[in-house]
Amino acid sequence: MRRRLLAFGTAFTTIGTAGFLGFGVAAADDTKPVDPAPGGAHAEAPSMGTPGRGYALGGAHVLGIPYDEYIMRTGADWFPGLDRQIVDYPAGQVQGHTLERLFPGIGALGERFMPGLGLDGPSYGESIDVGAPNLINAIRQGGPGTVIGLSEGASVLDEVQARLAYDPAAPPPDSLSFATYGNPVGKHAFGESFLTQMFPVGSVVPSLDYRIPAPVESQYDTYQFVSAYDSIADWPDRPDNWISVANAIVGLATGHTAVAFTNPSMVPPQNIRTTVNSRGAKDTTIMIPEEHLPLVLPFKYLGVDKDTLNKLDGVLKPYVDAGYSRNDDPLTAPITVDPVNGYDPAAVTAPATQAAFGGGTDPVSQLLAGLQYVVNNQPAPKP
C-alpha cells in the first residue's frame, strides 16, 4: 500500500498527460514501443581514468541517505581498483543558505527538533570555496589518481580544474583525471544543465550564493556522466515544452543521484562522445539511459507490466524529446530510454542503501530504512 501511495502522484500525472494527448494506456496497443540500442549493442567497459587514488566528493549532505556509502560507491563500476578516499567539505544544502536568511532563527529551531536537518548552514558557494583547497591539498598529498564528484561535488571539481589550469605547480596532465556525475553547471555533448541555461556566466544564483563560472580548458582528461532527462544536468533547451519540463523534474528524483551507481553495460556506443581541447585533453560525455521515461517509471513501482510500460514510453517519448534539440536529427540523437539495458534507479541505488541501513530493495523500503536510521541515530542537540 505504501509503495502505491509513493508512486501514485507521478503515475496520475502521467495518465493525465497521455489522456490529454489523446492516447490512453489502453489505446497504446498500436504504438510502437521504444526501441533499445540497435542490435542490442552496448559499450564495452572503456579504459577510463588515472590509476592510483580515488578522490571522491559527494553531493549535498541530506538526512536519510547513506552519505559516505554513496560517495565510496560513486563510479565504482566505471573506475574500479582505485584506492578511494573521501575528501571532506561542507556540502551545504540550498535550504541552509536560504531559509535562515528569510526566517532568522529557523536554523536553531530545526536543530532542537531534528539535529542535522540543515535549515541553517553553509551555502553552496561557501561549500565550494572550502572544498576546492581541501581537494587540492588531498591531491598534492595523495599523488596520481582520478577525482570523482557527484552533484555539488562536481562543482568542487570544476573549481579545482579552473585553479589548476594555469598553475605552474599543478600535477602533470597524465597524473590526474576528473569525473563528474550530474554536474549542476555542466555543458556536455548532448546538452547542458539547468543553471547554465538560466544564468549567464558571472551571474550569482541567489539561493546558492554561487557565481556561474566561465568555461575553462583543463589540461586533464574529464569524464561527464549524465542521466538522460535529469533536470539538474540535462535540462530541456526548449523549456516551453511542458511535457519535457515535467519529465525532467521527475528525472531529478529518479536519476540525478542514481547515475553514480551505473555501469558500462547500460550505455549504447552512440551515447559516448569524446572531444579533444586545444591543450590535448579529452572531454568525454557518457549519457546513461534509464529503462523507462522518468514519468513512466513510477508505474513500474506500482506493479505495471513491462509491455504496458514500453507502450507508455512509446506514447510519451516523442513529446518529451521534442523539448531537446539534440533529437532533431535521428542519426545523431542519443538513446535516452532503453527498456533492455537501461538502468532502474531503485535497483542500482539499493546496494548502497542496504549496506548502510538494511531493508529491502524497493523504493519504499529504502526510504523507510533511511528514515528509521535518522530517527535512531540523531546527533545530540547543540547546547
UniProtKB/Swiss-Prot annotation:
Enzyme class, first EC level, given as a word: transferase
GO biological process: lipid metabolic process
The keyword Signal appears for this protein: yes
Phenotype of gene-disrupted mutants: Change in bacterial surface properties resulting in lack of sliding motility, altered biofilm formation, rough colony phenotype, slower growth rate and enhanced susceptibility to antimicrobial drugs including rifampicin and erythromycin. Loss of trehalose polyphleates (TPP) production.
EC number: 2.3.1.-
Transmembrane segment boundaries: none
A Pfam family assignment: PE-PPE
Single GO term (MF): acyltransferase activity
Pathway(s) it belongs to: Glycolipid biosynthesis
Protein induction: By lipidic substrates. Expression is induced approximately 50-fold in the presence of Tween 80 and 2-fold in the presence of tributyrin.
Biotechnological applications listed in the UniProt record: Potential target to impair mycobacterial growth and to increase drug susceptibility.
Gene Ontology CC annotation, any one: extracellular region
Residue ranges of every copy of the PE-PPE domain listed in the record: 80-325
Keywords: Acyltransferase, Cell wall, Lipid biosynthesis, Lipid metabolism, Secreted, Signal, Transferase
SS bonds (residue pairs): none
Localisation: Cell envelope; Secreted, Cell wall
Family membership: Belongs to the mycobacterial PPE family.
Function: Acyltransferase involved in the biosynthesis of trehalose polyphleates (TPP). Catalyzes the transfer of phleic acids onto 2,3-diacyl trehalose (DAT) to form TPP, high-molecular-weight surface-exposed glycolipids consisting of octoacylated trehalose with seven C36:5 and C40:6 polyunsaturated fatty acids (phleic acids) and a C14-C19 fatty acid residue.
Protein name in UniProt: Acyltransferase PE
